[in-house]
Amino acid sequence: EILIGLVGSEMCIRDRNKRDDIQSRNMIYWQNIPYGKGGNIIAIACNNGKEVARHMLETTGKAKALKIELENADWKADGMDLQYVKVYAVDSKGRVVPATEGEVTFEVSGEARLIAVDNGDHMTDELFSGNHKKLHQGFVMAILRSSQTSGNVKIKASLKGLKSAEKKMTTK
């Protein structure tokens, strides 16, 4: 079963759907949850009365800045190694703001080059090439390829109206 609701208010319970009921087996529908009024929504999954998973979504503020996260801590200068640079639109508390729209522009300097940009939106026909990409769910990614020379790399992500983000890395 799943319990869901706003933190501090009454939780709604949803029993497991019957697998032989074609109408509802893959449907999750909740009633009486006051969406859109702010606060934190929590979902708790239970199996035989024991909690097995928990997830919480927080209401965010307005996007204020971009934030960069790197995937590869050990980046090799072999001309083939990739660095996945994740960029998020965040509020003043650092929370991702999924409703943020706009196009992020990337600037890369040093011992790497920008080879692709993506945002995870499967419904777009935008190309992966270029140095800019629209945010999707507050997210965009740049993919960098190292050169064959060890050295420093700098990437900057900017979006009009938000504070830019910059990250320095080293290839070895």
What are these model-derived regions, one by one?
Residues K64-I68, E107-M123:
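Short aromatic-acidic-glycine turn motif
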Residues K50-G61, K163-K172:
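Edge beta-strands of extracellular beta-sandwich domains
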Residues I28-Y35, L127-Q148:
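Short, hydrophobic beta-strand segments
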Residues I44-N48, S158-L162:
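Beta-strand-rich extracellular modules
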Residues M80-P98, V104, K154-A157:
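Beta-strand-rich structural segments
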Residues G36-N40, M80-L82, S150-N152:
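Extracellular Ig-like/FN3 beta-sandwich strand-entry sites
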